[in-house]
Design a protein with these regions (language model features):
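Second-shell loop/turn segments in exported
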Residues: 40-47, 127-135, 224, 304-312, ...
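Short, non-transmembrane alpha-helical segments in secretory-pathway proteins
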Residues: 40-76, 133-172, 222-255, 302-341, ...
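Feature responds to low-complexity, polar/acidic, surface-exposed segments characteristic
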Residues: 17-27, 541-558, 571-586, 594-624, ...
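Exposed beta-strand-loop-beta-strand "reactive/processing" segments of non-cytosolic proteins
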Residues: 61-112, 159-204, 249-281, 328-374, ...
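Extended intrinsically disordered, low-complexity coil regions enriched in Ser, Thr, Gly, Ala
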Residues: 97-142, 149-157, 192-230, 271-299, ...
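Sec-exported extracytoplasmic/periplasmic mature domains
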Residues: 63, 145, 149-153, 323, ...
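Sec-dependent N-terminal signal peptides of Gram-positive bacterial secreted proteins and lipoproteins
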Residues: 2-29
Length: 740
């Protein structure tokens, strides 16, 4: 596609494993990823790809699907590539209002052939994708399989068993459409290739709405043969003999609340990823080794806190520092400081964000770096100058040990007050062949335990230069007590009993490597990245045996009850013996309703501010968050007490539902409603408007023309009515502010 010019640079954090299908947290400390993927834009004048070309490509993939769009409805951006992948991408997007509803889409094509890399589509009408769904998962799988055929050379792609959405803990509001996700991976000799997937999301109305393609397999690829592989039993014994577990704090990201939650867990050792199926060598971050890697001990970077670099920096001082810090040979480029801005991070700290550009012949590159205002220390930096300053290819490259020493020196120079909380890398270094640089991850240490999800990342060029620095220290007030952890021996035994091996092909991270090694990769209780809760001794994630789970039996509401059970809305210890006709308490009913309509987080934006709407529901009460969320939604009104253990009546449920729909203003005018029920006289006048609306909207059915206002609501009743409420919310678009 010809030569390209770099015009700008955008720092973006990227979830590599699942793309657009679901935002997942980092699965494990033993996944070798850079903390940030750098998107570099190229000049539009240097590419022959036009908007019309991209639109034509889209219409070829989806014939007639987007006929309601004109070419003027589409938008394009400049082409871009990544620091670790020079293939140029081209973005196409659209947004339009159709019959009063927003329609949105974004598409990315890549390479000379404009292969589809990602696709996301939000259609106007998704009513058929709500419960009860028009298409089953099996139906959707057939649709996904047919769409897969649109990609070239995918005949050998096989559907993958769903791995856990690790660390991704929320319930989907039932007012949102059902999306079935399928992941396909290429195979060779019947063996799956790791890190190569095509993920396809299909709405329950049959529309393909999400696609993500994670890297292509080169036509030059070579593969180990499977004929001489070692037996699985021998390798399993080898792994068990060298197996170890490690105690870790794990920061689990809660997406709806935008907060971190800390767990104390046992994890398998991160010193190896698998065993070569032919040689028996151990797979590490940087290739295969003959001896089993040893587990490293914690070695702090500093025994006590060092003085901050320059406390209380002013804007003027930051600008002058930037001119010096970012200085390059003026014959190579001219530095322009565009802006020094202030922002507050999630810890409440003020950061200076310095935006700058290097202007050089025929183009320029730009980025921003950040400085902590209170300490004057760099918290985020990426060396853009490497894009136009060529290093001496004949110069001797420093070793990994020398690079590590350089990285520590840079931290002492540019972020000294942080490093007493961090330790030397516990994992092997990473080497980036594209950028000719070493990458190091320095874990935070609390109570002598390394923290997964809070690391300092430093990259050092083979010439010894600082290529990147990233600090994102999390503010966590409460860390689980290590003294309450189950023994490491018990955790090791649990891991060992659950250990299984998966045969797969993996490619080493080398720029010129097209060879795939045959590797046995360990998995635990069905997941490569599983963990054991150190406080309970139980798996954080359990193997999905949903097809074998006991089902709830009921003559009229079995489907609704089991759907809520599958969605983790309804919690039942023994579904097979559960009596769904049991009257439900107000507390339990409120919990089910809110879990059905929200993402499952019931906290305040500012956790230091606590509210108590009822005297008997204090912050320590198990339903405190749910009750307070219901108050914020207007479902409940503050009062002296909330009768959490009292059974819920049908007229009370009607009021809650109408308040959820924000129709209480209309319902309050009870004198305008005529109730045609045979038992209308038994309905409390205060509830008359709510009952009338709930009945008219089909949320709560009458029973032989009797509303039975004071009768108790059963679990079965609530299941049926809650799913009807979810559909009403979707149709009336009244739920958007509930999804915290």
């Amino acid at each position: 596609m010809g030569k390209f010019k770099k015009l700008g640079i955008i720092l973006t954090s990227t979830a590599f494993s699942v793309g657009v299908l679901s935002p997942m947290a980092q699965a494990s400390a033993n996944v070798k990823d850079s903390p940030e993927r750098i998107e570099i834009q190229v000049a539009s004048t240097e590419t022959k790809v036009t908007k019309s070309t991209l639109i034509k490509k889209l219409r070829e993939l989806f014939p007639e699907k987007f006929n309601f769009l004109t070419d003027n409805d589409f938008y394009t951006g400049r082409g871009h590539y990544y620091n670790d992948d020079k293939t140029i991408r081209y973005d196409l997007s659209f947004q339009k209002t159709v019959n009063g509803k927003d329609v949105y889409g974004s598409i990315t094509f890549m390479g000379d052939d404009l292969d589809l890399e990602s696709f996301y589509y939000q259609p106007a009408n998704v009513a058929d994708a709500l419960y009860p769904a028009k298409y089953s998962k099996d139906d959707a799988q057939k649709i996904a399989q047919d769409f897969l055929k649109k990609f070239p050379n995918t005949a050998n792609y096989k559907l993958q068993e769903n791995d856990f959405d690790y660390g991704f803990n929320y319930t989907r509001p039932l007012s949102e459409p059902i999306t079935y996700s399928f992941s396909y991976a290429p195979t060779h000799n019947g063996v799956t290739l790791s890190n190569h997937t095509i993920s396809i999301g299909v709405l329950a109305n049959g529309e393909v709405v999400q696609v993500y393609r994670n890297s292509n397999v080169s036509k030059k690829a070579t593969f180990d043969g499977v004929e001489q592989k070692k037996s699985e039993a021998d390798v399993l014994a080898q792994v068990r003999d060298n197996f170890a577990v490690e105690l870790r704090y794990y920061l689990d990201y809660n997406y709806p609340s935008d907060k971190r939650e800390v767990k104390l867990v046992y994890m398998p050792t991160s010193s190896f990823y698998g065993v070569h199926a032919l040689t028996g060598q151990w797979q590490t971050a940087n290739g295969f080794v003959a001896q089993a890697p040893s587990v490293k001990g914690v070695e702090k970077l500093a025994s006590e806190q060092l003085d901050p670099r320059k406390p209380g920096m002013t804007v003027e001082e930051v600008e002058e520092f930037a001119k010096s810090f970012l200085k390059v040979d003026p014959d190579k480029a001219k530095l322009q400081i565009e802006m020094v801005d202030e922002r507050e991070n999630e810890n409440g700290e003020t950061l200076y964000s310095v935006s700058y550009m290097y202007m050089y012949e025929n183009g320029g590159s730009g980025a921003s770096f950040e400085i902590n205002k209170a300490t004057g220390e760099i918290t985020q930096y990426y060396d853009v100058s490497r894009d136009f300053v060529q290093s001496d290819s004949k110069a001797e490259k420093i070793t990994k040990d020398a690079a590590l020493a350089k990285a520590i020196d840079y931290l002492k120079e540019w972020a000294p007050s942080y490093i007493h909380n961090y330790a030397k890398p516990l994992e092997d270094y990473g080497y980036d062949n594209y950028g000719n640089q070493y990458g190091f991850s320095f874990p935070r240490v609390v109570n002598g335990i390394p923290v997964v999800g809070d690391e300092i990342y430093v990259s050092v060029g083979t010439d010894g230069s600082l290529r990147g620095l990233n600090i994102n220290q999390q503010k966590i007030d409460n860390w689980p007590s290590v003294s309450k952890a189950v023994s490491a021996d018990k955790a090791k035994e649990t891991f060992s009993d659950a250990l299984k091996l998966k045969l797969q092909y993996t490619k080493q991270d080398k720029e010129d490597s097209n060879h795939y090694d045959l590797v046995y990769a360990p998995s635990y209780e069905g997941s490569i990245y599983n963990q054991i809760d150190a406080l309970t001794g139980k798996w954080v994630s359990s193997a999905d045996d949903s097809n074998n789970k006991p089902q709830i039996s009921h003559p009229t509401a079995a489907e609704e009850l089991n759907y809520l059970l599958a969605q983790n809305v309804l919690e039942v210890k023994d579904p097979a013996s559960f009596n769904a006709d049991t009257a439900i308490t107000k507390g339990e009913a409120l919990k089910i309703i809110l879990k059905s309509l929200t993402y499952g987080y019931y906290g305040y934006g500012n956790e230091e501010e606590t509210y108590q709407s009822f005297n008997n529901i204090d912050p320590k009460h198990p339903l405190y968050g749910i009750v307070e969320q219901a108050v914020r939604m207007g479902v409940l009104q503050p009062a002296d007490e909330f009768a959490v253990d009292a059974t819920l009546t049908r007229q009370e449920l009607a009021e809650w539902f109408i308040r959820v729909l924000r129709l209480e203003s209309a319902a309050k005018h009870n004198d305008i409603y005529k109730l045609n029920f045979a038992d209308a006289g038994s309905i409390d006048p205060a509830y008359a408007g709510y009952v009338a609306l709930a009945s008219a909207m089909g949320l709560i059915d009458a029973q032989q023309n009797n509303f039975n206002a004071t009768e108790k609501v059963s679990y079965a009743d609530l299941a049926v009515s809650t799913l009807r409420l979810a559909r009403a919310i979707h149709e009336n678009n009244t739920g958007r502010n509930y999804f915290y």
